[in-house]
């Protein structure tokens, strides 16, 4: 498609650790760039309603941990599924904005607490990254976008082993302000 990933790293991932990968979510290419960037096995946590999209949904529900954000029981199931993946040595990826904003002018929407709560409860480091160009290269608007660079910034890793659940908002704000 003519995209050239350029990665700048402030941190390196350790092979023997699981991580909570987070990034801004502005484009359909975010998932592919996350897979390209991390080089570690991981599973996405995503919205259950996306599993209803024809064809895409077939693969989506077989490869992701699905959450129904309106169902407390679903959130508990996500907690258990995430723990199972961490026990298998996998990492988890969540886009903390909870989806792509409908407003094309929003560059970074508010973060939801879920990724940070899960990371703290499981004592898993948070590995934030920023996708600078994805919205410009391949936005959700039809007939727009262009080939070119897709810059990724891998930020410092936030350790969670001393944090309590009450610290989730502070962790959320620190990562969002990167």
Feature map (PLM): residue ranges:
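Short gly/ser/thr-rich secondary-structure transition/capping motifs
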Residues: 1-8, 75-76, 134-137
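Catalytic core of membrane glycerolipid acyltransferases/transacylases, capturing the structured
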Residues: 2, 15-72
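Generic preference for hydrophobic
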Residues: 7, 21, 44, 152-154
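Short acidic-hydrophobic, aromatic-tinged amphipathic segments that line or gate anion-handling sites
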Residues: 8, 65-68, 160
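A short beta-turn/loop motif at secondary-structure boundaries
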Residues: 10-15, 144-145
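Residue-level detector of flexible, active-site-proximal loop/helix-junction positions
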Residues: 12, 51, 71, 133, ...
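Short, charged, surface-exposed secondary-structure boundary motifs
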Residues: 53-57, 76-78, 154
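Non-catalytic C-terminal accessory region of glycerolipid acyltransferases
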Residues: 78-178
């Amino acid at each position: 498609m003519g995209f050239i990933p350029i990665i700048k790293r402030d941190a390196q991932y350790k092979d023997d650790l699981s991580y909570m990968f987070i990034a801004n979510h502005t484009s359909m290419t975010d998932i592919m760039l996350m897979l390209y960037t991390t080089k570690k096995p991981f599973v996405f946590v995503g919205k259950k309603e996306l599993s209803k999209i024809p064809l895409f949904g077939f693969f989506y529900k077989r490869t992701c941990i699905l959450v129904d954000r309106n169902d407390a029981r679903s959130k508990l199931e996500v907690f258990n599924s995430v723990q199972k993946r961490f026990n298998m040595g996998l990492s988890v990826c969540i886009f903390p904005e909870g989806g792509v904003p409908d407003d094309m002018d929003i560059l970074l929407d508010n973060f939801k607490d879920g990724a940070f709560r899960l990371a703290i409860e499981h004592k898993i480091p948070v590995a934030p990254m920023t996708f600078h160009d994805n919205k410009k290269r391949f936005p959700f608007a039809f007939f727009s976008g262009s080939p070119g660079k897709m810059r990724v910034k891998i930020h410092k890793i936030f350790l969670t082993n001393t944090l309590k659940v009450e610290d989730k908002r502070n962790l959320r704000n620190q990562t969002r302000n990167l």
